[in-house]
């Protein structure tokens, strides 16, 4: 671990999806193409994106998060014990509603055999003497916030009556993914965390979490586990 950024300039790692990829994902959702057909389009568009990153002189390369429908939820869905469901209402951004997916707990959370490890291996294949493959991931706090988003918290508490056990399993799941990524050759992991912005507005946080997790509790969790 280093406290200094390895490069003078850098990127977040998420890029706008090309129309060809968006069309392929929509066709897959409608059952018009198979998963392998979608993967082929993803592979081809990621390869094009990486060439653009290299041409721009970037020293880290990512897949642009092209294999995801959301920047964070797809990673959560890759954990064992977590399932994808659709809500009646999606996220709200300045009056605009996004898609309605979320993540709920259905069993003991585990990071074993996470699909993002295979995703990383594809990007790793494009590394050269000037570039390093990066894996972007949503932070553990983002997962905790999602599991207590709206009525999700009732489901979470039913599976995990003891909050400490939930926190320990989330931490263990992330450590498993980190180990597997390391063994796959990953030396650059970026954690993205939007919960910091949620904390700026107490009213928003309380409305979103419906009192399930208070800001005081989050602070206590941070002190205990960081």
Label each PLM-derived region with a short phrase.
Residues 1-225:
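Domain-level signal for soluble alpha/beta catalytic cores
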